[in-house]
């Protein structure tokens, strides 16, 4: 705390610097301070004067600068609390996840430049090295995970998709949506499919289209299993592709209908125009009549074929229109009725698919699984009926009279089940599980093919390593909606892992792959130099 006024500081400085001999002692007595204080005041006053008039920043300027720096420092601290730490390991994680989601290398580079700035962002070559390491690491991780999944993959939906004329063999477990097979192969022959499928020894049922190579591979797998005293896998023909072929034929027929209809309308406009001009329409009305006859004939043919298909389509459903459980005998009866009515070369493929015994394998499998529940036949039929009635119930928002009637019928059937067995709920859950998990179409693998097509549109090419990275990401990705919400495919399949996090599974192997890549690069450079 200052006890001596500044005036005495200046007087003390004057006595010390320019005063005669004895001035310091006299001024110390006048200011009531010690001689040392006089010397200190002289030093401080001299320094203050030199600082003020020495050509440097003034005191006011220094104070203003300090205040500005303090404000800047406070702002930087506020920004620091809002920033995200983004070290090199985080950048590698970002790259691996983005590539797994289908983002291209160039897009990853742009996003990292936005986050880090153009100068701090890694180069494209660096990102490419990370991508290669992540793909190799994913292959190592998947080799272990596939081994753990083999006991749990009992049903598979199989298909192939082409990228740059090279097939990718795809297999998906439909209930969990685990992508268990994603192999970029040189061909799609039966031997190639067999080499990939024979590792999945727990497969009991597969569904696919009628592709020659795929069917040959499944047949070879069945022969191998019989020769080694294993239970041969059941094979079902995909209902989805059968329906798609029917819709293709019907669309072609409808295009003919539209073309003839347009010609008939054009003929009618020509006749009407001549009438308006006062010209004779003799001969033109006959052409108009013939045009409409052709259009009507083609339209009626389309309606007949469509009606035939709507009836035979019911043979490919789990339940008949009356709510009874479908079976092979009834389904084949509907097909036998429809075949003569689907004549013509354009329907040849549809007829061949419908006549294939494997089109109704799912019905045989369904009845076998229900029989294995060991329930009384009356109770089993009642529970199956209850499940079907529950599927017919409208949504809560649909408060219609028909909805009320259906709800009443369902309640009556429920009471009937309770009278048959007071402990009916547990049996119902078992029956519902069988009905709910019936697989008659390879929609799951078609879903996966759609994802792969989307990814292919963003990448120049899908390498085997990149496919492995995408497969690992898909199988560890948590579903955000639908009946699988909240869990990833591996969890739905029942595979027990220490963690299901994509980066946690990949990180260690990716660092090892990066280290190995550096060693290989040094070895290559040394060889070139030598």
Task: Please describe what each predicted stretch is.
Residues 2-22, 84-103:
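Short, amphipathic alpha-helical "recognition" segments used to contact nucleic acids or chromatin
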Residues 12-13, 27, 38-41, 95, ...:
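Mobile genetic element proteins and their domesticated derivatives, centered on retroelements
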Residues 23-32, 108, 112:
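Short alpha-helical "recognition helix" segments of helix-turn-helix
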Residues 39-58, 129-140:
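Short, solvent-exposed alpha-helical "recognition" segments
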Residues 49, 252-270, 434, 444-462, ...:
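Active-site proximal helix-loop segment of RNase H-like, two-metal nucleases, encompassing DDE(D)
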Residues 68-225, 252-256, 267-270, 282-291, ...:
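RNase H-like nuclease fold core
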Residues 223-255, 259:
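Inter-helix linker motif
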Residues 303, 310-314, 377-389, 395, ...:
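C-terminal domain-tail junction helix/linker
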């Amino acid at each position: 705390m200052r006890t001596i006024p500044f005036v005495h500081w200046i007087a003390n400085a004057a006595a010390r610097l320019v005063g005669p001999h004895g001035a310091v002692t006299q001024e110390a007595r006048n200011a009531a301070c010690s001689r040392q204080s006089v010397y200190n005041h002289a030093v401080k006053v001299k320094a203050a004067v030199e600082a003020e008039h020495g050509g440097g920043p003034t005191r006011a300027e220094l104070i203003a600068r300090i205040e500005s720096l303090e404000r800047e420092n406070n702002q930087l601290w506020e920004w620091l609390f809002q920033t995200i730490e983004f070290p090199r390991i985080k950048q590698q994680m970002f790259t691996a996840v983005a590539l797994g989601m289908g983002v291209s290398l160039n897009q990853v580079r742009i996003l990292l430049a936005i986050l880090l700035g153009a100068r701090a962002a890694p180069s494209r070559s660096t990102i490419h090295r990370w991508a290669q390491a992540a793909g190799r690491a994913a292959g190592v991780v998947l080799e272990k995970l596939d081994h753990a999944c083999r006991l749990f993959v009992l049903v598979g939906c199989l298909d192939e998709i082409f990228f740059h004329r090279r097939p990718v063999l795809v297999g998906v477990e439909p209930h969990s949506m685990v992508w268990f097979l994603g192999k970029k192969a040189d061909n799609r022959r039966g031997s190639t499919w067999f080499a990939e499928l024979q590792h999945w020894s727990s497969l009991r049922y597969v569904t696919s289209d009628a592709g020659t190579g795929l069917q040959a591979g499944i047949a070879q797998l069945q022969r191998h299993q019989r020769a080694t005293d294993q239970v041969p896998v059941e094979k079902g023909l995909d209902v989805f592709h059968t329906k798609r072929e029917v819709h293709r034929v019907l669309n072609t027929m409808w295009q003919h209908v539209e073309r003839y209809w347009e010609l008939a309308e054009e003929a009618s406009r020509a006749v009407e125009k001549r009438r308006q001009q006062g010209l004779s329409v003799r001969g033109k009305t006959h052409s108009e009549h013939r045009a409409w006859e052709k259009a009507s004939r083609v339209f009626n043919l389309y309606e007949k074929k469509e009606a035939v298909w709507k009836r035979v389509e019911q043979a490919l459903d789990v339940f008949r229109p009356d709510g009874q459980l479908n079976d092979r005998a009834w389904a084949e009866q509907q097909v036998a009725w429809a075949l003569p009515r689907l004549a013509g070369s354009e329907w040849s493929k549809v007829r061949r698919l419908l006549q294939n015994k494997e089109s109704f394998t799912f019905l045989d499998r369904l009845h076998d699984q229900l029989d294995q529940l060991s329930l009384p036949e009356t109770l089993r039929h009642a529970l199956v009926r209850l499940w079907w009635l529950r599927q017919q119930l409208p949504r809560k928002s649909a408060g219609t009279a028909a909805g009320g009637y259906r709800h009443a019928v369902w309640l009556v059937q429920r009471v009937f089940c309770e009278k048959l067995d007071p402990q009916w709920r547990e049996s119902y859950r078992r029956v519902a599980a069988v009905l709910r998990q019936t697989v008659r179409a390879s929609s799951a693998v078609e879903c996966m093919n759609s994802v792969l097509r989307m990814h292919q549109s963003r990448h120049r090419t899908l390498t085997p390593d990149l496919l492995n990275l995408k497969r690992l990401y898909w199988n560890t990705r948590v579903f955000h909606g639908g009946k699988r919400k909240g869990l990833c495919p591996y969890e739905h399949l029942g595979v027990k892992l220490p963690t299901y996090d994509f980066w946690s599974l990949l990180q260690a192997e990716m660092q090892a792959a990066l280290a190995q890549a550096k060693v290989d690069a040094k070895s290559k450079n040394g060889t070139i130099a030598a």
